From Swiss-Prot:
EC number annotated for this UniProt entry: 6.1.1.3
EC class (word): ligase
One Gene Ontology term of the molecular function aspect: threonine-tRNA ligase activity
Keyword ATP-binding included in the entry's annotation: yes
Descriptive protein name: Threonine--tRNA ligase
Residues bound to Zn(2+): C334, H385, H511
Quaternary context: Homodimer.
């Protein structure tokens, strides 16, 4: 007679073992219809799962995050069902859930086309709209293997042979004549899987190993209802318009080429943005009392062996040899900063020591993972390392948090999700030190009125960390900022200071990043602003145009005056119609276009127009200059009269 306790604390008693769906039906027919799965004593299970003992139960519906994930997983099975009907010789590999959707890797004897994708999606919808029940059956390992051998599903057989114990009882999910194997849970009926869209096809090696066969990966998205799907597809459409690669080309910011994969060739306007960003961060470093240093970008492999990077990270490191010595091009700045700390005798009076660098780093990312500025091999990292005592951890973390929020607010990012990762099972350092560190990190967040969630066991082996994830205007997540405590590296590399009692002690080190990679952050900003960079960051801030040759001298004089004031201004004296010039510079997202005709020359004014098409009328040159300088100096996100 199991007693079921629901999330609101109410209880229901049943005579015999009862399924999740039975409990939902007992509560009400509406909930039974909406029931996708259940969470029994914290574990996600299928709606058909029997509960035999007293248990805590939460009914999962499409309104829950878990419910949506299950819908997506079941859509992957639906894809398998449809593709086997269309091309029966297809061999199914794996079909997991990913962010916003799912994919399935398939082995097919022909290359899928866009037309095939449309045919496949149509068949999926036809099948889903029959609202068939999904039947789950537990079988022995041998029965599962026999099933997939008979069906010619070589990849499923390989999964059983290599990944599943022969003592296990795998779950087989029956979609009419189609059978798939999965840990589940899955939807009980395909009425939950009507709102999906197949998106693209890519190549993927079986097991992610380039020595294995290349499979075709079919990506799709799935949502709980039509409205959610429509909104997501609209966001994708908007994201495509904002793609930094497309805008980067339109605005002539940078380019990539095959001879230097994952490394940007910065053009003048793109490099202007880069340098402005660097200058801004540099001002903040001075404000928050950091030293700026510069370490070599290449160091002997021996040093990387001492740090542990060679053992754990060598696949991602570029190397070169000279005079019988092997060198590693640095993937990160921290070992170099420890070397600087070690020069000379350090005292507790020198701490905290905040050391920042715009470090040129390189990581050997897989070529298939490279993506514009967002995923590169060569990048500039804005990280810093703070050497401090255990007693200074709290104040230093506080200082880091203030800096991070100070910077993010300048760019208009308001939604920031914060996570605190705590000690993993395998770690170094005494528990007492971990206690201090975790308590101080949490207190610093609380002191700054920052909501956060714990990620138990997700910290690095050498210390806990805080992660700051930005959400952009399309609600996409970008993990940029980190504050990571490190109890290991300074000791590994022999760093120490003289404590107040004249004993040698190893400093605590904080790794701190705000923007992360400057290249990636420029990519994020390009998409956030759709290329309409705030005036202070815009590569060209003002363009001054004449209507006829008679205003050329006035235009050149005005441009020089603006340039002398530190404003990035240029003249456009081409013999083109003024409407043509305005349109061209509007497409280039120049914040201000100044038009000079005879009337403006006579009055000492300029006709001001913004890139958004707003006509600000005739403004006195000095008034405009002062207002513009104020906008630039304050790093305002808004243009004049916005």
């Amino acid at each position: 007679m199991p007693i079921i306790t629901l999330p609101d604390g109410s209880q229901r008693q049943f005579e015999n073992a009862v399924s999740v769906m039975d409990v939902a039906a007992d509560i009400g027919p509406g909930l039974a219809k909406a029931c996708i799965a259940g969470r029994v004593n914290g574990e996600l299970v299928d709606a058909c799962e029997l509960i035999e003992q007293d248990s805590q139960l939460a009914i999962i519906t499409a309104k829950d995050d878990e419910g949506l994930e299950i819908i997506r997983h079941s859509c992957a099975h639906l894809l398998g069902h449809a593709i086997k009907q269309l091309w029966p010789q297809t061999k199914m590999a794996i079909g997991p859930v990913i962010e916003n959707g799912f994919y399935y890797d398939v082995d097919l004897d022909h290359s899928l086309t866009q037309e095939d994708l449309e045919t496949l999606e149509k068949r999926m919808l036809e099948l889903a709209k029959t609202d068939y029940d999904v039947i789950k059956k537990r079988v022995t390992w041998a029965q599962a293997r026999e099933t997939f051998v008979a069906r010619g599903e070589d990849y499923k057989v390989a999964i059983l042979d290599e990944n599943i114990s022969q003592d296990a009882h795998p779950a087989l999910y029956h979609h009419q004549e189609y059978i798939d194997m999965c840990r589940g849970p899955h939807v009980p009926n395909m009425r939950f899987c009507h709102h999906f869209k197949l998106q693209k096809i890519a190549g993927a090696y079986w097991r992610g190993n380039s020595d294995n066969k290349m499979l075709q990966r079919i990506y799709g998205t799935a949502w709980a209802d039509k409205k959610q799907l429509k909104a997501y597809l609209e966001r994708l459409e908007e994201a495509a318009k904002r793609d930094h690669r497309k805008i980067g080309k339109q605005l002539d910011l940078y380019h990539m080429q095959e001879e230097a994969p994952g490394m940007a060739f910065w053009h003048n306007d793109g490099w202007t943005i880069f340098r402005e960003l660097e200058t801004f961060v540099r001002c903040k470093l001075k404000e928050y009392d950091y030293q700026e240093v510069k370490g070599p970008f290449m160091m002997d492999r021996v040093l990387w062996e001492k740090t542990g990077h060679w053992e754990n990270y060598k696949e991602n490191m570029f190397t070169t040899s000279s005079e019988n010595r092997e060198y590693c091009i640095k993937p990160m700045n921290c070992p170099g900063h420890v070397q600087i700390f070690k020069q000379g005798l350090r005292s507790y009076r020198d701490l905290p020591l905040r050391m920042a660098e715009f470090g040129s780093c390189h990581r050997n990312e897989p070529s298939g993972a490279l993506h514009g500025l967002m995923r590169v091999r060569g990048f500039t990292q804005d990280d810093a390392h703070i050497f401090c005592t255990e007693e200074q951890i709290l104040s230093e973390v506080n200082n880091c948090i203030k800096l991070i929020y100070d910077v993010y607010s300048t760019f208009g990012f308001e939604k920031i999700v914060v996570k605190l990762s705590t000690r993993p099972e395998k770690r170094i350092g005494e528990d007492a030190l971990w206690d201090i560190a975790e308590t101080d990190l949490a207190k610093a967040l609380t002191d700054n009125n920052i909501e956060f969630e714990y990620q138990p066991g997700e910290g690095a082996f050498y210390g806990p960390k805080i992660e700051f994830t930005l959400y952009d205007c399309l609600d996409r997540a970008w993990q940029c900022g980190t504050v990571q405590l490190d109890f290991s590296l300074p000791g590994r590399l022999g760093a120490s200071y003289v404590a107040e009692n004249n004993e040698r002690k190893v400093p605590v080190m904080l790794h701190r990043a705000v923007l992360g990679s400057l290249e990636r952050f420029i990519g994020i900003l390009t998409e956030e602003y759709a290329g309409f960079f705030p005036t202070w960051l815009a590569p060209q801030q003002v363009v001054v145009m004449n209507i006829t040759d008679g205003q050329a001298d006035y235009v050149q004089k005005l441009v020089k005056e603006l340039q002398d004031a530190g404003i990035r201004a240029k003249a456009d004296l081409r013999n083109e119609k003024i409407g043509f010039k305005i349109r061209e510079h509007t497409l280039r997202r120049v914040p201000y276009m100044l038009v000079c005709g005879d009337k403006e020359v006579e009055s000492g004014k300029v006709a001001v127009r913004t890139r958004r098409g707003k006509d600000l009328g005739s403004i006195d040159v000095n008034d405009f200059k002062e207002k513009l300088l104020q906008e630039i100096r304050s790093r305002s996100l808004h243009q004049l009269e916005e």
